[in-house]
Amino acid sequence: SLLQFREMITKMTGKEPIFFYAFYGCYCGLGGRGKPQDATDRCCFVHDCCYGKVTGCDPKKDIYTYSEENGAFVCGGDDPCKKEICECDKNAAICFRNDLDTYDYKYLLYSPENCQEESEPC
């Protein structure tokens, strides 16, 4: 679920996702189009693509099972669809952490008008 995704991002980055990522670049937050603007925006693009491949459950609403072991998230549970959502969220949270040093505030509250280029395929 989006609440679990928020939790993962906060634990991985120490940042509040609603302020730091919800309105960043062309792909972070609702929707997405154009060309990812930087590495952080690409994390969101890849996450959107990952959600797009999930069938049989709702990535934004369905609650999955995960645990933390030695600072890493481990996706669990018996439902393969929910496990897939968890993996999408986990990989995006890791991506955000890995790209913290290139986060650029100029892409925060980025205007959709700047995202007019043709979108690349997933």
From Swiss-Prot:
Active-site residues per Swiss-Prot or TrEMBL entry: H47, D89
Protein's GO biological process: arachidonate secretion; lipid catabolic process; negative regulation of T cell proliferation; phospholipid metabolic process
Cysteines engaged in disulfide bonds, as pairs: C26-C115, C28-C44, C43-C95, C49-C122, C50-C88, C57-C81, C75-C86
Organs and tissues of expression: Expressed by the venom gland.
Keywords recorded for this protein, A-Z: Calcium, Disulfide bond, Hydrolase, Lipid degradation, Lipid metabolism, Metal-binding, Secreted
Family annotation (SMART domains): PA2c
Primary location recorded for the protein, binned into one broad class: secreted
Protein location: Secreted
Enzyme Commission number(s) from the entry: 3.1.1.4
Recorded GO CC terms: extracellular region
Catalytic activity: a 1,2-diacyl-sn-glycero-3-phosphocholine + H2O = a 1-acyl-sn-glycero-3-phosphocholine + a fatty acid + H(+)
Misc remark: Is not myotoxic or lethal. Lacks anti-coagulant, platelet aggregating or anti-aggregating activities.
Role summary: Acidic phospholipase A2 (PLA2) that only causes a mild edema, when subcutaneously injected in the mice foot. PLA2 catalyzes the calcium-dependent hydrolysis of the 2-acyl groups in 3-sn-phosphoglycerides.
Name used for this protein in its record: Acidic phospholipase A2 BlatPLA2
Organism: Bothriechis lateralis
Lineage of producing organism: Eukaryota, Metazoa, Chordata, Craniata, Vertebrata
